[in-house]
Amino acid sequence: MNYSYPFSYDWSTQEIIDVIKFFEAIETVYEKGMEREKLMNIYRRFKEIVPSKSEEKKLCDEFEQASGYSSYRVMKKAKEAQNGDWIRME
């Protein structure tokens, strides 16, 4: 991993940590997979920090440019899945 995670200097240290946890979860879904409930809990916390759709899109686009991992596709798949499902990107 030779990239940095997008964040805002307006956030608290804990908020930055929680946003980074979200992007790390996206990486995990691509690399190993993750339980839907765990991913959704991490996403809910991310949305508490980033409630704006436009800011979410901006941050996720920056992350995808840097990493090649699509947060949008992961969350679309997770939202379509059922509780108990394992989410993994091919």
UniProtKB/Swiss-Prot annotation:
Please give the Pfam families that the UniProt record associates with this protein: UPF0223
**Xref: SUPFAM superfamilies:** BH2638-like
Xref: NCBIfam families: PRK04387.1
Similarity section: Belongs to the UPF0223 family.
What is the protein named?
A: UPF0223 protein GWCH70_0965
Which organism does this sequence originate in?
Geobacillus sp. (strain WCH70)
